[in-house]
Regions:
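A short, basic/flexible loop-to-alpha-helix module at the beginning of a structural domain
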Residues: 2-17
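Glycine-rich phosphate/diphosphate-binding loop of Rossmann-like nucleotide-binding domains
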Residues: 15, 20-55
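Short, ordered loop/turn segments at secondary-structure junctions
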Residues: 27-30, 55-58, 76, 93-94, ...
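A short helix->loop->beta-strand "cap" motif at the edges of active sites that frequently abuts
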Residues: 46-48, 114-119
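N-terminal beta-loop-helix "entrance" segment that forms/cooperates
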Residues: 48-73, 130-132
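Hydrophobic/aromatic beta-strand patches that form the interior of the parallel beta-sheet core
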Residues: 51, 72, 89, 118-122
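Glycine-rich phosphate-binding loop
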Residues: 70-108
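Short, glycine-/small-residue-rich phosphate/pyrophosphate-handling segment
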Residues: 121-161
Length: 161
């Protein structure tokens, strides 16, 4: 067992070392997060621990129905969880304060961006941001690429999935 101390809490979380913990973060309706979770489950199976974090309960509920192990909603859940996971996956807007029509707070964006977790970002956003060097791909193609990246990260981490 390994102890992980979070930056935002004096509590210590005890978990098994050999399990990769993924945090899927989404807001609004949770559709991108749900699609990611379905893709991860189809490719990597049930042994993977997927935490669904939503900026609201609707997004979290939709991701839970897609196959997440556990879920949490709102700023505090996102801030606390982001420092206890190995990988964070979501749309690029999870790094932008006030994104998702204001649902993603500055504290959420700071927690995600400062987390030691590897971040896999889907280049979809409704914000007025354009990313150079990114071609427009449909969501299913982007999900496949993200799942492949998670598979590579799991192999690099040499953890059980």
């Amino acid at each position: 067992l390994k102890q992980d101390a979070t930056l935002f809490s004096p509590e210590v979380i005890v978990r098994e070392v050999d399990t990769v913990r993924l945090m899927v973060l989404d807001g609004q309706g949770g559709g991108i997060g749900a699609t990611l979770i379905k893709g991860l489950r189809a490719s990597l199976g049930l042994d993977l621990e997927i935490l669904a974090l939503g900026t609201n309960s609707i997004a979290t509920s939709r991701m839970m129905k897609a196959g997440a192990n556990r879920g949490g909603s709102g700023e505090n859940a996102i801030v606390r969880t982001s420092h206890g996971v190995d990988v964070i996956i979501g749309p690029v807007s999870i790094l932008m304060a006030n994104a998702m029509m204001g649902e993603l707070t500055p504290k959420m964006a700071t927690a995600v961006s400062s987390s030691p977790a590897t971040k896999i970002l889907i280049p979809l956003t409704q914000e007025r941001v354009r990313i150079v060097g990114i071609s427009r791909e449909p969501l299913p193609h982007l999900v496949n690429l993200a799942v492949t990246m998670v598979e590579e990260i799991v192999l690099e981490m040499d953890k059980h999935v």
